């Protein structure tokens, strides 16, 4: 990811655009992070994605399906910087395609406004309160069917979560040609290697 980011920012500069604020620190409610950059003054996060994930940037549907929290992340940076225009420069790492998705957090006429309007400060306060609770929170997402096998698997966002085994202690991992698949229920044993 870091090499792709550096390559893309070099290409952005070579094409005549201005890149600034690289890895500038941002802070909101005690949460500190480093933004990727601003391109021509627009707060920008650089992403390398699979072909499947790339569609969300190309089709401008990220706001409606954001399992990795990219929206909240960039809203935090925007709050820290006092910006309202944000964007993602995404590269499909399988095909080399590029897309730039730009949202204006204050554009009340935009189709994504209802999804984007939640105040990031309130969101951060809520998450901090949830983390302080003695009991773990409800599951973020429910398992989904794994095709027609009768098995249930973690949704994409949960499959990357470091706490998936806390939520699902009996989780089983099977190694498919497309990568690991995390099954919460096994009705039919997959005919691929299980990772223990």
Regions found by a protein language model. Name each.
Residues 41-45, 82-85:
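Short, functional N-terminal and low-complexity linear motifs
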Residues 22, 46, 89-91:
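Generic beta-sheet signal
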Residues 64, 76, 80-196:
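Metal-dependent nuclease catalytic regions and adjoining charged, substrate-binding loops involved
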Residues 71-74:
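The N-lobe alphaC helix and its flanking beta3-alphaC-beta4 segment of protein kinase-like domains
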Residues 48-52, 92-95:
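Short connector loops/turns at beta-strand edges and beta->alpha or beta->beta junctions
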Residues 1-43, 50-64, 68, 183:
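Metal-dependent nuclease catalytic cores that hydrolyze phosphodiester bonds in DNA/RNA
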């Amino acid at each position: 990811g870091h090499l792709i980011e550096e390559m893309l920012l070099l290409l952005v500069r070579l094409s005549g655009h201005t890149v600034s604020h690289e890895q500038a620190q941002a802070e909101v409610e005690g949460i500190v992070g480093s933004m990727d950059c601003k391109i021509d003054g627009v707060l920008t996060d650089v992403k390398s994605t699979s072909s499947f994930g790339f569609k969300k940037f190309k089709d401008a549907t990220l706001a409606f399906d954001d399992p990795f929290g990219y929206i909240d992340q960039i809203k935090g940076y925007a709050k820290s910087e006092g910006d309202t225009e944000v964007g993602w420069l995404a590269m499909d790492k399988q095909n080399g395609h590029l897309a730039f998705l730009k949202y204006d957090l204050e554009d009340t006429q935009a189709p994504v406004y209802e999804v984007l309007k939640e105040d990031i400060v309130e969101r951060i306060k809520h998450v901090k309160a949830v983390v302080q609770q003695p009991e773990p929170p409800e599951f973020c997402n429910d398992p989904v069917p794994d095709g027609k096998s009768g098995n249930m698997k973690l949704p994409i966002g949960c499959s990357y979560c470091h706490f998936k085994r806390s939520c699902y202690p009996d989780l089983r991992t099977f190694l498919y040609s497309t990568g690991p698949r995390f099954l919460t229920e096994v009705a039919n044993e997959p005919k691929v290697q299980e990772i223990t």
